[in-house]
């Protein structure tokens, strides 16, 4: 497993990028502004996005990621997050006011993005890699 740090700051400017890590080529942990430094080819390879929480410095580039490559893919980008974080994304970002709801585009059977609820302590296994959400106070 190769982990590439795309950003680890709470702000932007100069060399600062907000939190995001690329695992191998296909898994993103958080979607901070460092995602914007990836090439179009690298963006297209991302199949899964794990969100640690809903703060803007961790989710800012998710709408742009899906908007940029969603129509170029044959399968949806899967967004993994707790029920609380998913509800915040649906209510405040992918709500047709701030950004389109890509879980319904082009239709609900074939979306560009799919939400998957993470439960604390329950692992998600992807290609032999295990990801487990743990509680944090932030």
Residue ranges and their predicted role:
Residues 29-31, 59, 133:
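Short capping micro-motif at the N-terminus of alpha-helices
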Residues 1-42:
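Conserved beta-strand hairpin/beta-sheet module of binuclear metal-dependent hydrolase folds
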Residues 34-84:
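Active-site metal-binding motif and surrounding structural segment of the metallo-beta-lactamase
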Residues 84-137:
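Metallo-beta-lactamase
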Residues 18-20, 76, 119-123:
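Short, acidic/polar N-cap/turn motifs at the starts of alpha helices
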